[in-house]
Amino acid sequence: MVKPIHVLSGPNLNLLGTREPEIYGKDTLDDVRTRCEARAASRGVSVVFRQSNHEGVLIDWVHEARESASALVINPAGYGHTSIALLDALKTLSIPVIECHLSNPAAREEFRRHTYVSLAATGIVSGFGAASYELAIEAAFGLIRA
């Protein structure tokens, strides 16, 4: 049996649907969770879906994924631009890591164009709104089945 795909969302994503919907869309994080669970289920895989505004909690979940996940999808949000500690945690993984962003950071402010997480990511999906998560699930599935 394939281990679940862990999906982690960083700070402020609990406000998805109400915070800057012109950038991040109108779907809530619960909507995203439902879509990810359905997409994964269609491939015979389950999802562990979590969100935290706290860097240390995200790092603990990355450590947990070392043993319990087949792949990790992470939307680090603002921590992608600032957290070397999160990068270091991700570098301990031997499973596929897919970095996921709702918007396209390369088309936004200069400070958003670099993410530390990308240095540990197998691949990046960005700019497709809530569908970025589903596309990341598909990418993860493809990598664990390869």
Swiss-Prot record:
Question: Which reaction(s) does the protein catalyse, per the Swiss-Prot or TrEMBL entry?
Answer: 3-dehydroquinate = 3-dehydroshikimate + H2O
Which pathway is recorded for this entry?
Answer: Metabolic intermediate biosynthesis; chorismate biosynthesis; chorismate from D-erythrose 4-phosphate and phosphoenolpyruvate: step 3/7
Summarize where substrate binds, as residue positions. Answer: N75, H81, D88, L102, S103, R112
> Active-site positions, per UniProt?
Y24 (proton acceptor), H101 (proton donor)
Give the Enzyme Commission number. Answer: 4.2.1.10
Q: Where is this site: Transition state stabilizer?
A: R19
The enzyme class is lyase
Write out the GO MF terms.
3-dehydroquinate dehydratase activity
- Report TM segments: none
| Alphabetic keyword roster | Amino-acid biosynthesis, Aromatic amino acid biosynthesis, Lyase
Q: Which domain of life is it from?
A: Bacteria
InterPro entries membership? DHquinase_II (IPR001874), DHquinase_II_CS (IPR018509), DHquinase_II_sf (IPR036441)
Tell me, which GO biological process terms does this entry list? amino acid biosynthetic process; aromatic amino acid family biosynthetic process; chorismate biosynthetic process; quinate catabolic process
A Pfam family it matches: DHquinase_II
Q: Which family does it belong to?
A: Belongs to the type-II 3-dehydroquinase family.
Q: Supply the PANTHER family for this chain.
A: CATABOLIC 3-DEHYDROQUINASE
Quaternary structure per UniProt? Answer: Homododecamer.
Q: What task does this protein carry out?
A: Catalyzes a trans-dehydration via an enolate intermediate.
Q: What is this protein called?
A: 3-dehydroquinate dehydratase
Q: What is the scientific name of the source organism?
A: Caulobacter vibrioides (strain NA1000 / CB15N)
Write the lineage as a comma-separated list. Answer: Bacteria, Pseudomonadati, Pseudomonadota, Alphaproteobacteria, Caulobacterales
